[in-house]
Protein backbone atom coordinates (compact mmCIF):
# COMPACT_ATOMS: atom_id res chain seq x y z
CA UNK A 1 0.00 0.00 0.00
CA UNK A 2 2.79 2.43 0.93
CA UNK A 3 4.55 1.53 -2.32
CA UNK A 4 1.47 2.54 -4.32
CA UNK A 5 1.22 5.81 -2.37
CA UNK A 6 4.86 6.59 -3.13
CA UNK A 7 4.28 5.88 -6.83
CA UNK A 8 1.30 8.26 -6.88
CA UNK A 9 3.21 10.98 -5.06
CA UNK A 10 6.20 10.43 -7.34
CA UNK A 11 3.94 10.81 -10.38
CA UNK A 12 2.58 14.05 -8.98
CA UNK A 13 6.08 15.30 -8.17
CA UNK A 14 7.26 14.49 -11.69
CA UNK A 15 4.32 16.41 -13.10
CA UNK A 16 4.99 19.44 -10.91
CA UNK A 17 8.65 19.46 -11.87
CA UNK A 18 7.79 19.30 -15.56
CA UNK A 19 5.23 22.08 -15.30
CA UNK A 20 7.48 24.51 -13.44
CA UNK A 21 4.93 24.73 -10.63
CA UNK A 22 5.90 24.22 -7.02
CA UNK A 23 3.87 24.49 -3.87
CA UNK A 24 5.82 27.63 -3.01
CA UNK A 25 4.08 29.41 -5.90
CA UNK A 26 0.64 30.96 -5.82
CA UNK A 27 -1.13 28.86 -8.44
CA UNK A 28 -3.12 30.32 -11.28
CA UNK A 29 -6.49 28.64 -11.91
CA UNK A 30 -5.00 26.67 -14.81
CA UNK A 31 -2.20 25.52 -12.46
CA UNK A 32 -4.86 24.17 -10.10
CA UNK A 33 -6.43 22.22 -12.97
CA UNK A 34 -3.20 20.75 -14.30
CA UNK A 35 -1.99 19.84 -10.82
CA UNK A 36 -5.18 17.86 -10.13
CA UNK A 37 -4.93 16.27 -13.58
CA UNK A 38 -1.37 15.25 -12.73
CA UNK A 39 -2.64 13.43 -9.66
CA UNK A 40 -5.47 11.81 -11.63
CA UNK A 41 -2.95 10.53 -14.17
CA UNK A 42 -1.08 8.81 -11.37
CA UNK A 43 -4.25 7.38 -9.91
CA UNK A 44 -5.41 5.93 -13.23
CA UNK A 45 -2.32 3.73 -13.14
CA UNK A 46 -2.99 2.45 -9.63
CA UNK A 47 -6.76 2.04 -9.37
CA UNK A 48 -7.68 -1.60 -10.13
CA UNK A 49 -10.84 -1.04 -12.17
CA UNK A 50 -9.37 1.69 -14.39
CA UNK A 51 -9.37 -0.14 -17.70
CA UNK A 52 -9.26 2.01 -20.88
CA UNK A 53 -13.05 2.64 -21.12
CA UNK A 54 -13.36 3.47 -17.41
CA UNK A 55 -10.43 5.86 -17.55
CA UNK A 56 -11.82 7.58 -20.66
CA UNK A 57 -15.17 8.07 -18.92
CA UNK A 58 -13.48 9.68 -15.92
CA UNK A 59 -11.48 12.07 -18.11
CA UNK A 60 -14.72 12.97 -19.90
CA UNK A 61 -16.53 13.99 -16.74
CA UNK A 62 -13.40 15.63 -15.36
CA UNK A 63 -13.10 17.81 -18.45
CA UNK A 64 -16.73 18.88 -18.24
CA UNK A 65 -16.31 19.71 -14.55
CA UNK A 66 -13.38 22.08 -15.04
CA UNK A 67 -14.99 23.60 -18.12
CA UNK A 68 -18.29 24.38 -16.42
CA UNK A 69 -16.51 25.71 -13.33
CA UNK A 70 -14.87 28.36 -15.50
CA UNK A 71 -17.69 28.91 -18.01
CA UNK A 72 -20.09 29.75 -15.18
CA UNK A 73 -18.24 33.02 -14.61
CA UNK A 74 -16.84 33.70 -18.08
CA UNK A 75 -17.85 36.44 -20.49
CA UNK A 76 -16.56 34.36 -23.40
CA UNK A 77 -17.37 30.71 -22.68
CA UNK A 78 -20.85 29.26 -22.84
CA UNK A 79 -22.13 26.23 -21.01
CA UNK A 80 -22.18 22.75 -22.51
CA UNK A 81 -25.54 22.11 -20.84
CA UNK A 82 -28.00 21.36 -23.61
CA UNK A 83 -25.16 20.32 -25.93
CA UNK A 84 -23.95 17.22 -24.10
CA UNK A 85 -26.44 14.39 -23.74
CA UNK A 86 -28.41 14.65 -20.51
CA UNK A 87 -26.48 17.62 -19.12
CA UNK A 88 -28.87 20.22 -17.73
CA UNK A 89 -29.80 22.11 -14.60
CA UNK A 90 -26.28 23.01 -13.50
CA UNK A 91 -25.95 25.40 -10.55
CA UNK A 92 -25.21 29.03 -11.39
CA UNK A 93 -23.13 31.66 -9.68
CA UNK A 94 -25.09 34.24 -7.73
CA UNK A 95 -25.35 37.45 -9.74
CA UNK A 96 -23.41 40.41 -8.40
CA UNK A 97 -21.33 38.32 -6.01
CA UNK A 98 -17.56 37.82 -6.14
CA UNK A 99 -16.13 34.36 -6.81
CA UNK A 100 -12.61 33.05 -7.26
CA UNK A 101 -11.90 30.53 -10.02
CA UNK A 102 -9.00 28.85 -8.24
CA UNK A 103 -11.08 28.20 -5.14
CA UNK A 104 -14.02 26.95 -7.21
CA UNK A 105 -11.81 24.60 -9.23
CA UNK A 106 -9.99 23.22 -6.22
CA UNK A 107 -13.25 22.61 -4.34
CA UNK A 108 -14.86 20.98 -7.37
CA UNK A 109 -11.91 18.71 -8.10
CA UNK A 110 -11.44 17.81 -4.44
CA UNK A 111 -15.10 16.71 -4.42
CA UNK A 112 -15.09 14.99 -7.81
CA UNK A 113 -11.89 12.98 -7.62
CA UNK A 114 -12.50 10.86 -4.48
CA UNK A 115 -15.89 9.80 -5.87
CA UNK A 116 -14.50 8.64 -9.19
CA UNK A 117 -11.49 6.99 -7.54
CA UNK A 118 -13.14 5.74 -4.38
CA UNK A 119 -11.72 2.25 -4.82
CA UNK A 120 -8.15 3.46 -5.21
CA UNK A 121 -7.57 2.63 -1.54
CA UNK A 122 -6.38 4.53 1.53
CA UNK A 123 -3.10 5.56 -0.10
CA UNK A 124 -4.85 7.22 -3.01
CA UNK A 125 -7.35 8.89 -0.73
CA UNK A 126 -4.44 10.17 1.32
CA UNK A 127 -2.91 11.66 -1.81
CA UNK A 128 -6.22 13.46 -2.53
CA UNK A 129 -6.33 14.87 0.97
CA UNK A 130 -2.71 16.03 0.88
CA UNK A 131 -3.12 17.82 -2.43
CA UNK A 132 -6.43 19.37 -1.40
CA UNK A 133 -4.92 20.68 1.82
CA UNK A 134 -1.88 22.18 0.13
CA UNK A 135 -3.77 23.82 -2.71
CA UNK A 136 -6.54 25.07 -0.44
CA UNK A 137 -4.06 26.89 1.77
CA UNK A 138 -2.49 28.48 -1.28
CA UNK A 139 -5.58 29.57 -3.18
CA UNK A 140 -7.36 31.12 -0.18
CA UNK A 141 -4.31 32.94 1.18
CA UNK A 142 -5.28 36.58 1.82
CA UNK A 143 -8.77 36.16 0.37
CA UNK A 144 -11.92 37.52 2.00
CA UNK A 145 -13.71 34.80 3.94
CA UNK A 146 -17.04 35.37 2.21
CA UNK A 147 -15.43 34.87 -1.22
CA UNK A 148 -13.77 31.67 0.00
CA UNK A 149 -17.01 30.28 1.42
CA UNK A 150 -19.10 31.24 -1.60
CA UNK A 151 -16.58 29.89 -4.10
CA UNK A 152 -16.05 26.67 -2.17
CA UNK A 153 -19.77 26.06 -1.90
CA UNK A 154 -20.23 26.66 -5.62
CA UNK A 155 -17.39 24.32 -6.57
CA UNK A 156 -18.83 21.55 -4.40
CA UNK A 157 -22.35 22.04 -5.77
CA UNK A 158 -21.10 21.92 -9.36
CA UNK A 159 -19.16 18.71 -8.72
CA UNK A 160 -22.25 17.19 -7.10
CA UNK A 161 -24.31 18.04 -10.19
CA UNK A 162 -21.75 16.48 -12.55
CA UNK A 163 -21.54 13.36 -10.39
CA UNK A 164 -25.34 13.08 -10.37
CA UNK A 165 -25.36 13.37 -14.17
CA UNK A 166 -22.67 10.68 -14.45
CA UNK A 167 -24.77 8.19 -12.52
CA UNK A 168 -27.39 8.11 -15.30
CA UNK A 169 -25.07 7.14 -18.18
CA UNK A 170 -25.49 3.37 -17.93
CA UNK A 171 -21.98 2.60 -16.72
CA UNK A 172 -23.36 1.38 -13.41
CA UNK A 173 -21.94 1.80 -9.95
CA UNK A 174 -19.12 -0.33 -8.59
CA UNK A 175 -17.49 -2.45 -11.29
CA UNK A 176 -17.46 -6.09 -10.22
CA UNK A 177 -14.72 -8.57 -11.11
CA UNK A 178 -12.66 -5.71 -12.55
CA UNK A 179 -15.20 -5.47 -15.38
CA UNK A 180 -14.98 -9.07 -16.57
CA UNK A 181 -18.62 -10.18 -16.70
CA UNK A 182 -18.62 -13.75 -15.43
CA UNK A 183 -22.29 -14.23 -16.34
CA UNK A 184 -21.79 -13.48 -20.05
CA UNK A 185 -22.56 -16.32 -22.45
CA UNK A 186 -19.94 -16.35 -25.19
CA UNK A 187 -20.93 -16.94 -28.83
CA UNK A 188 -19.63 -20.17 -30.30
CA UNK A 189 -17.97 -20.47 -33.70
CA UNK A 190 -14.53 -20.33 -35.32
CA UNK A 191 -14.75 -16.56 -35.94
CA UNK A 192 -15.57 -15.57 -32.37
CA UNK A 193 -13.39 -14.32 -29.55
CA UNK A 194 -12.02 -16.82 -27.06
CA UNK A 195 -9.86 -16.13 -23.99
CA UNK A 196 -6.25 -15.31 -24.83
CA UNK A 197 -4.66 -16.01 -21.45
CA UNK A 198 -5.05 -18.42 -18.55
CA UNK A 199 -6.13 -15.92 -15.88
CA UNK A 200 -9.35 -17.24 -14.37
CA UNK A 201 -11.03 -13.84 -14.18
CA UNK A 202 -10.30 -13.10 -17.84
CA UNK A 203 -12.04 -16.13 -19.31
CA UNK A 204 -14.85 -13.65 -20.02
CA UNK A 205 -14.23 -10.38 -21.88
CA UNK A 206 -13.99 -6.88 -20.43
CA UNK A 207 -17.04 -4.61 -20.03
CA UNK A 208 -19.33 -6.15 -22.68
CA UNK A 209 -22.11 -3.66 -21.92
CA UNK A 210 -19.96 -0.52 -22.27
CA UNK A 211 -21.02 0.18 -25.85
CA UNK A 212 -24.58 0.80 -24.63
CA UNK A 213 -23.60 3.67 -22.32
CA UNK A 214 -24.91 7.16 -22.94
CA UNK A 215 -22.55 9.16 -25.09
CA UNK A 216 -21.38 12.71 -24.40
CA UNK A 217 -21.22 14.74 -27.63
CA UNK A 218 -22.36 12.39 -30.38
CA UNK A 219 -26.17 12.09 -30.10
CA UNK A 220 -26.18 8.34 -30.74
CA UNK A 221 -23.21 6.08 -31.23
CA UNK A 222 -24.74 4.83 -34.51
CA UNK A 223 -24.48 8.36 -35.94
CA UNK A 224 -20.93 7.43 -36.94
CA UNK A 225 -20.66 4.44 -39.25
CA UNK A 226 -17.88 1.93 -39.76
CA UNK A 227 -17.38 -0.94 -42.18
CA UNK A 228 -17.97 -4.46 -40.90
CA UNK A 229 -14.92 -6.70 -40.50
CA UNK A 230 -13.58 -8.65 -43.44
CA UNK A 231 -15.61 -11.86 -43.89
CA UNK A 232 -14.09 -14.57 -41.74
CA UNK A 233 -12.34 -17.37 -43.58
CA UNK A 234 -9.72 -20.02 -42.91
CA UNK A 235 -8.88 -20.30 -46.61
CA UNK A 236 -5.25 -19.34 -47.28
CA UNK A 237 -6.28 -17.33 -50.34
CA UNK A 238 -8.80 -15.23 -48.40
CA UNK A 239 -8.33 -11.62 -47.35
CA UNK A 240 -8.89 -12.57 -43.72
CA UNK A 241 -6.06 -15.11 -43.80
CA UNK A 242 -3.80 -12.56 -45.50
CA UNK A 243 -4.45 -9.99 -42.78
CA UNK A 244 -3.74 -12.55 -40.06
CA UNK A 245 -0.56 -13.61 -41.84
CA UNK A 246 0.52 -9.97 -42.02
CA UNK A 247 0.32 -9.74 -38.22
CA UNK A 248 2.37 -12.94 -37.99
CA UNK A 249 4.97 -11.85 -40.53
CA UNK A 250 5.37 -8.31 -39.18
CA UNK A 251 5.69 -9.65 -35.66
CA UNK A 252 8.50 -11.97 -36.75
CA UNK A 253 10.48 -9.19 -38.45
CA UNK A 254 10.07 -6.13 -36.26
CA UNK A 255 12.56 -3.30 -36.66
CA UNK A 256 13.94 -1.62 -33.56
CA UNK A 257 11.74 1.42 -34.21
CA UNK A 258 8.61 -0.67 -34.69
CA UNK A 259 9.31 -2.43 -31.41
CA UNK A 260 9.94 0.90 -29.68
CA UNK A 261 6.74 2.52 -30.89
CA UNK A 262 4.68 -0.56 -30.01
CA UNK A 263 5.91 -0.25 -26.44
CA UNK A 264 5.55 3.54 -26.43
CA UNK A 265 1.85 3.32 -27.31
CA UNK A 266 1.02 0.12 -25.41
CA UNK A 267 -0.87 2.12 -22.74
CA UNK A 268 -1.69 -0.96 -20.69
CA UNK A 269 -4.03 -0.57 -17.71
CA UNK A 270 -2.44 -0.69 -14.25
CA UNK A 271 0.94 0.07 -15.84
CA UNK A 272 0.31 3.29 -17.77
CA UNK A 273 -2.20 6.12 -18.18
CA UNK A 274 -4.29 4.03 -20.66
CA UNK A 275 -4.94 5.39 -24.19
CA UNK A 276 -7.21 8.21 -23.01
CA UNK A 277 -4.72 9.24 -20.35
CA UNK A 278 -1.98 9.26 -22.97
CA UNK A 279 -4.08 11.63 -25.05
CA UNK A 280 -4.66 13.86 -22.04
CA UNK A 281 -0.94 13.78 -21.26
CA UNK A 282 -0.18 15.06 -24.76
CA UNK A 283 -2.70 17.86 -24.30
CA UNK A 284 -1.23 18.81 -20.92
CA UNK A 285 2.27 18.99 -22.36
CA UNK A 286 1.08 21.30 -25.11
CA UNK A 287 -1.00 23.47 -22.79
CA UNK A 288 2.12 24.02 -20.66
CA UNK A 289 4.31 24.57 -23.72
CA UNK A 290 1.93 27.20 -25.08
CA UNK A 291 1.38 28.78 -21.64
CA UNK A 292 -2.35 28.46 -22.37
CA UNK A 293 -4.76 30.76 -20.59
CA UNK A 294 -7.55 29.45 -18.40
CA UNK A 295 -10.27 29.41 -21.04
CA UNK A 296 -8.09 27.66 -23.60
CA UNK A 297 -7.08 25.09 -20.99
CA UNK A 298 -10.62 24.08 -20.06
CA UNK A 299 -11.81 24.18 -23.67
CA UNK A 300 -9.13 21.71 -24.78
CA UNK A 301 -9.56 19.39 -21.80
CA UNK A 302 -13.35 19.31 -22.12
CA UNK A 303 -13.40 18.61 -25.87
CA UNK A 304 -10.67 16.00 -25.62
CA UNK A 305 -12.26 14.35 -22.60
CA UNK A 306 -15.69 13.90 -24.16
CA UNK A 307 -14.21 12.88 -27.54
CA UNK A 308 -12.16 10.09 -26.01
CA UNK A 309 -14.98 8.95 -23.73
CA UNK A 310 -17.28 8.67 -26.74
CA UNK A 311 -14.51 6.91 -28.68
CA UNK A 312 -14.30 4.16 -26.07
CA UNK A 313 -18.08 3.73 -26.10
CA UNK A 314 -17.95 3.44 -29.88
CA UNK A 315 -15.06 1.00 -29.88
CA UNK A 316 -16.79 -1.23 -27.33
CA UNK A 317 -20.03 -1.02 -29.30
CA UNK A 318 -18.16 -2.39 -32.32
CA UNK A 319 -16.27 -5.04 -30.37
CA UNK A 320 -19.40 -6.64 -28.98
CA UNK A 321 -21.35 -6.29 -32.21
CA UNK A 322 -18.92 -8.64 -33.97
CA UNK A 323 -17.10 -10.47 -31.15
CA UNK A 324 -14.20 -11.12 -33.57
CA UNK A 325 -11.34 -13.37 -32.48
CA UNK A 326 -7.89 -11.90 -31.90
CA UNK A 327 -4.96 -12.44 -34.29
CA UNK A 328 -3.06 -14.56 -31.77
CA UNK A 329 -5.94 -17.05 -31.66
CA UNK A 330 -6.18 -17.34 -35.46
CA UNK A 331 -2.41 -17.53 -35.94
CA UNK A 332 -1.87 -20.21 -33.31
CA UNK A 333 -4.77 -22.23 -34.71
CA UNK A 334 -3.93 -22.03 -38.43
CA UNK A 335 -0.40 -20.69 -38.98
CA UNK A 336 2.01 -21.30 -36.10
CA UNK A 337 0.90 -22.80 -32.77
CA UNK A 338 4.02 -21.50 -31.02
CA UNK A 339 3.69 -17.88 -32.14
CA UNK A 340 3.01 -15.09 -29.67
CA UNK A 341 2.57 -11.35 -29.96
CA UNK A 342 5.06 -8.77 -28.72
CA UNK A 343 2.41 -7.33 -26.41
CA UNK A 344 -0.04 -9.15 -24.19
CA UNK A 345 -3.35 -9.45 -26.02
CA UNK A 346 -6.12 -7.66 -24.09
CA UNK A 347 -9.09 -9.71 -22.91
CA UNK A 348 -11.78 -8.43 -25.25
CA UNK A 349 -12.64 -8.82 -28.96
CA UNK A 350 -10.56 -7.46 -31.82
CA UNK A 351 -12.80 -5.31 -33.99
CA UNK A 352 -12.48 -2.30 -33.81
CA UNK A 353 -9.11 -1.32 -32.35
CA UNK A 354 -9.78 0.82 -29.27
CA UNK A 355 -6.38 2.51 -29.55
CA UNK A 356 -7.19 3.50 -33.13
CA UNK A 357 -10.64 4.88 -32.34
CA UNK A 358 -9.24 6.86 -29.40
CA UNK A 359 -6.30 8.17 -31.41
CA UNK A 360 -8.57 9.25 -34.24
CA UNK A 361 -10.83 11.18 -31.88
CA UNK A 362 -7.84 12.84 -30.21
CA UNK A 363 -6.32 13.92 -33.51
CA UNK A 364 -9.49 15.69 -34.65
CA UNK A 365 -9.87 17.70 -31.44
CA UNK A 366 -6.22 18.66 -31.15
CA UNK A 367 -5.90 19.52 -34.84
CA UNK A 368 -8.84 21.90 -34.58
CA UNK A 369 -7.25 23.55 -31.55
CA UNK A 370 -3.69 23.83 -32.90
CA UNK A 371 -3.75 23.27 -36.66
CA UNK A 372 -2.87 20.63 -39.24
CA UNK A 373 0.91 20.95 -38.97
CA UNK A 374 1.53 21.45 -35.27
CA UNK A 375 4.80 19.67 -34.49
CA UNK A 376 5.34 18.40 -30.97
CA UNK A 377 7.30 16.01 -28.80
CA UNK A 378 5.49 13.49 -26.61
CA UNK A 379 7.26 12.71 -23.34
CA UNK A 380 4.45 10.67 -21.78
CA UNK A 381 6.53 7.53 -21.30
CA UNK A 382 9.65 9.23 -20.01
CA UNK A 383 8.96 8.27 -16.40
CA UNK A 384 8.83 4.63 -17.50
CA UNK A 385 12.14 4.80 -19.33
CA UNK A 386 10.63 5.28 -22.81
CA UNK A 387 12.35 7.79 -25.05
CA UNK A 388 10.26 10.77 -26.21
CA UNK A 389 8.85 10.61 -29.73
CA UNK A 390 8.40 13.55 -32.09
CA UNK A 391 5.57 14.12 -34.56
CA UNK A 392 4.91 16.64 -37.35
CA UNK A 393 1.18 16.67 -36.58
CA UNK A 394 -1.55 15.16 -34.45
CA UNK A 395 -2.67 13.08 -37.41
CA UNK A 396 0.81 11.59 -37.65
CA UNK A 397 0.76 10.75 -33.95
CA UNK A 398 -2.66 9.13 -34.31
CA UNK A 399 -1.50 7.08 -37.29
CA UNK A 400 1.52 5.86 -35.34
CA UNK A 401 -0.58 5.03 -32.28
CA UNK A 402 -2.94 3.02 -34.45
CA UNK A 403 -0.16 1.26 -36.37
CA UNK A 404 1.51 0.30 -33.11
CA UNK A 405 -1.20 -2.30 -32.59
CA UNK A 406 -0.12 -4.14 -35.73
CA UNK A 407 3.50 -4.14 -34.54
CA UNK A 408 2.38 -5.29 -31.11
CA UNK A 409 0.50 -8.22 -32.68
CA UNK A 410 -2.77 -7.06 -31.15
CA UNK A 411 -5.01 -6.23 -34.15
CA UNK A 412 -5.62 -6.99 -37.81
CA UNK A 413 -5.05 -4.08 -40.20
CA UNK A 414 -8.79 -3.67 -40.90
CA UNK A 415 -9.51 -3.10 -37.19
CA UNK A 416 -6.78 -0.45 -37.13
CA UNK A 417 -7.61 1.46 -40.31
CA UNK A 418 -11.38 1.40 -39.86
CA UNK A 419 -10.99 2.23 -36.18
CA UNK A 420 -8.97 5.33 -36.98
CA UNK A 421 -11.60 6.58 -39.44
CA UNK A 422 -14.41 5.84 -37.00
CA UNK A 423 -12.62 7.69 -34.22
CA UNK A 424 -12.22 10.77 -36.38
CA UNK A 425 -15.95 10.79 -37.05
CA UNK A 426 -16.68 10.55 -33.32
CA UNK A 427 -14.13 13.23 -32.49
CA UNK A 428 -15.77 15.65 -34.89
CA UNK A 429 -18.84 15.88 -32.65
CA UNK A 430 -16.70 17.03 -29.72
CA UNK A 431 -14.80 19.36 -32.00
CA UNK A 432 -18.08 20.93 -33.15
CA UNK A 433 -19.29 21.81 -29.64
CA UNK A 434 -20.00 25.52 -29.33
CA UNK A 435 -17.92 26.89 -26.47
CA UNK A 436 -17.63 30.58 -27.34
CA UNK A 437 -20.44 33.09 -26.97
Name each region found by the language model:
Residues 1-10:
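Bacterial N-terminal signal peptides that target proteins for export
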Residues 3, 14, 152-155:
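A general structural signal for short secondary-structure junctions and capping/turn motifs
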Amino acid sequence: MMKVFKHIVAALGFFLLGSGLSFADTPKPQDVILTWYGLVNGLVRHTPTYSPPVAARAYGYLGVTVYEAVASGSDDLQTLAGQLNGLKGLPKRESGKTYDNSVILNAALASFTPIFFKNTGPSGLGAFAALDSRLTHQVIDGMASDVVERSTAYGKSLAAAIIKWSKTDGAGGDIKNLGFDQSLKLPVGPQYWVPTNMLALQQKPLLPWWGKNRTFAIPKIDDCKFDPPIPFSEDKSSEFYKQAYEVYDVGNHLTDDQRALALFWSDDPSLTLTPAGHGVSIAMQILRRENADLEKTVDVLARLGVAQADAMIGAWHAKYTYFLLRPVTYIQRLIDPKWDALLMTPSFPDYLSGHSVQAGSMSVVMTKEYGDNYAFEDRTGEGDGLAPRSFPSFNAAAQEAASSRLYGGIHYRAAIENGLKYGKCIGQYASDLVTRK
